[in-house]
Amino acid sequence: MSLDVIVGLQRGDEGKGRFVDLLAGEYAIIARGNGGANAGHTVIPKGAREPLALHQIPSGIAYPDKLNVIGNGVYLDPPQLSGEIEAVRSAGLPVSAKNLLISSAAHLVLPHHILLDSLRESGQQAQGSTKSGIAYVAADKYLREGIRLEAIFEPSSLLLERVADGLRTVNELLPANRRQSKAEITKAADAWLRSTEQLKTYVADTVEVINDKLRAGERVLAEGAQAFWLDIDHGMYPAVTSSSTTVSGLLDGLGVSAKHLGKVVGVTKAVKSHVGGGPLVTEVTDQKLADRIRGPLGKTDSEYGVTTNRPRRIGYPDLVELRNAVLINGVDELAISKLDHVPRYGPTVSVATSYNYRGKQRRTAPASAIALAGCEPNYKELETWDKELSEVRDYADLPAKAVEFVEFFETELGVPVTRIGVGPRREQVILKPSK
């Protein structure tokens, strides 16, 4: 059978988790194959009133009878993951080796990786990272000096020494007033090691597990972390993440051949946003307008980072960047979230249809932060609508201007829209009939 994929087409925070949550019931396995604790997503379990914030556990955990897999391409943070498992259980959902497996080949985020990340972000080389240590665990991976999850089965004294040694090395780089004592280093390393104990029960050869299911005719849903424009190769380098966020990267991070690839669903928000540094060509510069679009901190569907609570920068809808993402990911269907937020822009909304760059007009975006900073958007104005959409469930009940907005995306991107989000809850999704 096939492996279907859901990927973000913008810069993260598109609402992928809620569409995975919606579709998960149709699949035997829900898997994550990239990203790490720096990639947050939220789901609202059936019957729950409060959202569940996840980072490393797949969104399918909201379905107790589904197997969730964390693949070899994920950068795993053991203390954070252990806490996440407890949070899921506190929400009334079971977690065991029956519904969660983790690749033995996943690389581990160590305490000194996070320390290095924090140190860099406090200096002049800050890039607006989530301080999750991802860049540094990735560096160790490609230097072939990393520690994989399989190492937690080594004698604990050996692993403890490796972790402590990393802390000691970084400790020497710190200013005198921030250095840790030997006792503090030992304590930090020991706490990290203890967090790996409960993970042992979930460790498996997930490549074998997933491929066995596919050969048996089962369906697998791969959930992409972050989004296209944060991809290490095709994104706005260097304001990117440290892994591939494309469909091909996700397949590699799960150990699945491209011959199993089925449907690719690309998720985009009707409201564009971005957390951290890097250019935002269509950025809303009117701060009062940006605040209105963003919404208040603490509300489920407001524009604040799941991982950091940082306010997201707000932009106008951008079809130029979306064309790159649709092309390289081979997107078959579009899911649009937050259609209900479009009227926050005002009576009309500006939609970027092309850029001017170095005296030429282009319909796709350059994959470079430097080049993007030199682009100017060309907009088409679309009228918004007055009707509240949060209770709409039938496409035929959408106001005409909302339909025009959706169909403008379809025409410009050459891909059908199949699902439309009009609120944060699982049921607040409109299925768009095919033409």
For each feature predicted by the language model, list its residue ranges.
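Non-transmembrane, aqueous-exposed alpha-helical and coiled segments at domain scale
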Residues: 1-435
